[in-house]
Amino acid sequence: MRTLVMVACAVSLAACSSPPKPPTVSGRHRIPINSPAAQEELRLQVFPQEPTAQATMWPARPPKQTVNVYFPQDVTVFRPTSAQINQLHTLLWPVPKHINVRGLTDNSCPPPGDTQVARVRALAIYNWLINQGVPASRITISYAPVKDYASNAPLSPGRVLNRRVDIEILRK
């Protein structure tokens, strides 16, 4: 039994000590390593291209745009309609370089009253713009009771055009 174990150990040791057969190379998968195609393939393997997020491009805008917000007589509270909100949001993003807010009236009250109405309307728009995320440093307010009439008509339809706040958006 001992001899049998010794023979088995000798055979297994002899089998382990023989070198493995060399691999056979056919050469059909060879590519030149220095060719431009091979270098490009290697570059793509090392740095695979990741999908990049598309940058949001805003349409080209004119350097200056003016929006008029009209108010009923003696009303100073700004309650924008959904159409006004959509229009203003479209114009406000990306945030413009500067915004001029100018409150105007129809000259229906004595000058001190009209001045106060124009000022409060301009402040209402100013506060709304700040609540929408426009930095206060980019907004300038002005108001005038008797200036820049859109209509010189003394009747009510013409006066409606004068009761407004002009929002001038400057991009440059």
Swiss-Prot record:
This is Type IV secretion system putative outer membrane lipoprotein BMEII0036. Residues 58-172 form the OmpA-like domain. Its main location: membrane. InterPro entries: OmpA-like (IPR006665), OmpA-like_sf (IPR036737). The keyword Transmembrane helix does not apply. Keywords: Cell outer membrane, Lipoprotein, Membrane, Palmitate, Signal, Virulence. It comes from Brucella melitensis biotype 1 (strain ATCC 23456 / CCUG 17765 / NCTC 10094 / 16M). Disulfide bonds: none annotated. Pfam families: OmpA (PF00691). A lipid is attached at residue 16 (S-diacylglycerol cysteine). GO terms for cellular component: cell outer membrane. It is a lipid-anchor. It comes from the Bacteria.
